[in-house]
Amino acid sequence: MYSELKKIIEQAWENRELLSEEPVRQAVRQVVELVDKGQLRTAEPVDPAKSEWKVNEWVKKAVILYFPIQPMRKMQAGELEWYDKMEVKHGYEELGVRVVPHAVARYGAYIAPCAILMPSYVNIGAYVDTGTMVDTWATVGSCAQIGRHVHLSGGVGIGGVLEPVQAAPVIIEDNCFIGSRSIVVEGAHVCREAVLGSNTVITGSTHIIDVTGPEPVTYKGYVPPRSVVVPGSYRKQFPAGEYSITCALIIGQRKESTDKKTSLNDALRDFGVSV
């Protein structure tokens, strides 16, 4: 469907001199507009049941190419002033999105109907699906993929991944609850219905240790579906002695048999997770 656009973007990626040609610049802008409308994504689910996703590298390339073709300009809202290449997103009433002052989403970020932006920030290339709340001072980085009915609590940091273009963005799947001041970065993948307790840090290399069985099972950059996760530590020997290393602990599971909200409350009550 977008084969011609993809061809132009790939050629411009290999030869940046082509960006001086207006048809190429128009193609780049068209891709970013489609991302802004949610018709194209920098990453998308291939098999949601298995939490399998694919990265649309050519779309990420278009987002990156958008920066050099945009001129710096002054923007104002009353007495407030900015000087940047990127416009902010507009038309929230028509989009059916609730946006509380002083929330900001950049043009090129898709915000689905019934999403709520408290005073927060959403960067270009991101996808925020329907019913999701981005709470106060939470940030959604470039190209991050946030599913349906997700709650990003106050101060949550969702990292952005533009380059390398083949790298997967941060993915937070449907019905996840990310506790306050938690950080998910470096292309980490939090699968559906997972709960992250307050101050949990998940990076691409974080040891995520399932301690619910007779033996620990360690994941990296991946939180399995319905996991209840809290900050933790493990001991590691160094030349200077033994020290604690930060990790994340899977201490339980949300039950499929219960309603999503009830399941969340049960998880917090049963495992003492602070959010």
Positions of predicted regions on the chain:
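Structural signal for interior beta-strand "rungs" in well-ordered beta-sheet cores
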Residues: 97-237, 250
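Terminal amphipathic alpha-helical/low-complexity segments used for targeting or macromolecular assembly
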Residues: 1-97, 220, 226-227, 231-275
